[in-house]
Amino acid sequence: MGGQNGRVLLSEIAEVSRVVATTGARLAKIEALAGALREAGPFEVPIAVAYLSGELPQRQIGVGWAALRDGFTPADTPTLTLSEVDSGFSAIGAVSGKGSTAARRALVGELFGRATADEQRFLVGLLSGELRQGALEGVMTEAVARAAAVPVAEVRRAVMLRGSLGAVAAAALAGGSAALAAFGLEVGRPVISSSVLVNSRTEPPET
């Protein structure tokens, strides 16, 4: 994968997503996710956390099923990086005004035209909200701790205070426990309940 210099390919994240979605063992999920996070560059970590959780960092970019249903001719080889996909989604979400629907579809077509068939399936799942990862927030929190070699309690505390697992993951992998300790209460920022981070839904037993 991309390593410390980043440049993680979307295909690599899509494959980790597939492994996590088809793996029943909690520890195997955690290790697969942690491995992906270790390979991501500093700016890619929050994107990887979001994608592997089945979410878009941008939340909504104005792309519905109508823009995806006709399909796109896939690329033969994977070249798209996480950063390129994230930038593409941001550009799509920024389109507004007269002719925005056509412009947005053109950008979607351009992005999907660079994706392989497997990557396209992953992107459709991501955009439609139908991506089923098995990477619940509690599992991802533990994966961040594993990847950064820090106690999971430190990650949970930081997320409670910061409110963003992606931002906390980037800090943890870059600066370890010292970076996590720097997170504190901020005026106007709500504190997340720790129970959400421990297990947001029913998990399979650890094996």
Where do the model's predicted regions map?
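N-terminal nucleic-acid-engaging modules of covalent nucleotidyltransferase systems
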Residues: 1-207
